[in-house]
Amino acid sequence: MAKLIEFNIEARRGLEAGMNTLADAVKVTLGPKGRNVVLEKSWGAPTITNDGVSIAKEIELDDPYEKIGAELVKEVAKKTDDVAGDGTTTATVLAQAMVREGLRNVTAGANPMGLKKGIEAAVQAVSARLSDMAIDIETKDQIASTASISAADPTVGEIIAEAMDKVGKEGVITVEESNTFGLELELTEGMRFDKGYISPYFVTDTERMEAVLEDPYILIVNSKISSLKDLLPVLEKVMQSGKPLFVIAEDVEGEALAGLIVNKIRGTFKSVAVKAPGFGDRRKAMLNDIAILTGGQVISEEVGLSLDAVTLDLLGRARQVVVTKDEATIVDGAGDSEQIAGRVSQIRKEIENSDSDYDREKLQERLAKLAGGVAVIKVGAATEVELKERKHRIEDAVRNAKAAVEEGIIPGGGVALLQASKAAEIEGLEGDELTGAQIVLAACTAPLKQIAINAGLEGGVVAEKVAGLPAGQGLNAANDEYVDMVEAGIIDPAKVTRSALQNAASIAALFLTTEAVIADKPEPVKAPAGGGDMDGMGGMGGMM
């Protein structure tokens, strides 16, 4: 395919135009008075959202250079969302501010590599200041406040705080769609471990890249599965039952993996395979934990069980299994509660008797997985559009609350960034490196200005006023009053703000140091077969 290529200012100008189109669509959603954006769907009703990453994903531009610019900024939003569950709009606003100011300086003759070094030094200093400002979360109310801001709904904040209170700060919280209206919290026996699907062909929900199995059988094998002949008897038995199959093994490869994938693609049989967690003796112990939780049996030569002789009563069961590329969650295993309690007390005894800190830590992880359970937030809504949007928002709020617990909270509403930006005034920087640091200093005011603009205020005036206020005080855009942000419950997780700043700076540095852009040349639109406007037939009238 032929390529288009642009250099220098023209290349960067195309990228910037694409970035601005995307950022302008996303930034209107920032703050408590942020607006909504309507997303047209190729089928079904349109979606109404104010979630930055959802809006960014929908934007596809015609111009090849603008398209690349928009894709780069999408990466900022997506990466921030993946790490922290929120801050996507803040990251986009920061990236736009840094790129705009940076390109102005590059056009004026600044050295892009010098600017990049200055930006990186300033971001490191501001990130460290944000971490220093962070306050550890101690109360349920603080968790509720953080999650409420992310979800823009106090009820959601309260239910997430309740869920974290029940399963612990490291516990598993999942969000499910419900047929009933409103929100409901349910605690179930469950376990999550850090192994994702072996092949993406197992995915059942392509939008979320998840494989979800309802009421599956669970095959637990302490060896590799490579022969389809060995696996076939158990597959046939499970297929006859009409249930899906979740396979946990040391590895699934070759014709066995191919057989599972082919059946999944054809739609004849739904299954997911993951590698067993842990190594050596620890893997054996974890597989036994899973077997007890699900009411199954570990298929192993050691206990005289071979794969080709497996019957359905040796398989585990669960209400649901959710597998992503990184982890698997078993919800509501069908194991006997007395056996689970016995296993828990056995692990507790092992913890007491262990004299190795490492072993004790791993045993405590197993105990948490087995005894902690899973909190399931069931969400319902009046329409499917609202349900999808609400579910996504709650999932983001859960990740946001976990980020707050992990690294603490800071004043929200763009205030912490503005006040931490003073750390970008680094002594010893000069020339283009100093200019790079000043770009970060100016960009750190952009989120607060945008929140003020969305609330109908003058951004520059608000930023100047907040800069003169005592630390931690800023604008409550919901009622246009200046308050102590933490006391008013306007807080952000430090991890969210830090990730947004670092990801924005990373992409800004890429923009500034780009000297050429190579894009696919759009193919000319072919005329439809047998086309023509039949003008040539005008003279046929005389033949009548």
From Swiss-Prot:
Q: What is its EC number?
A: 5.6.1.7
- Tell me what reaction this enzyme catalyses: ATP + H2O + a folded polypeptide = ADP + phosphate + an unfolded polypeptide
GO BP field: protein refolding
Location(s) in or outside the cell? Cytoplasm
Supply the alphabetized keyword list. ATP-binding, Chaperone, Cytoplasm, Isomerase, Nucleotide-binding
Question: Where along this sequence does the record place binding of ATP?
Answer: T29, L30, G31, P32, D86, G87, T88, T89, T90, G413, N476, A477, A478, D492
Domain of life, per the record? Bacteria
Q: Which PROSITE patterns match?
A: CHAPERONINS_CPN60
Disordered as annotated region, ranges: 523-544
Q: Which InterPro entries match?
A: Chaperonin_Cpn60_CS, Cpn60/GroEL, Cpn60/GroEL/TCP-1, GroEL-like_apical_dom_sf, GROEL-like_equatorial_sf, TCP-1-like_intermed_sf
What is stated as this protein's family in its record?
A: Belongs to the chaperonin (HSP60) family.
Assembly description: Forms a cylinder of 14 subunits composed of two heptameric rings stacked back-to-back. Interacts with the co-chaperonin GroES.
Name used for this protein in its record? Chaperonin GroEL
Source organism per UniProt: Cutibacterium acnes
What's the gene? groEL
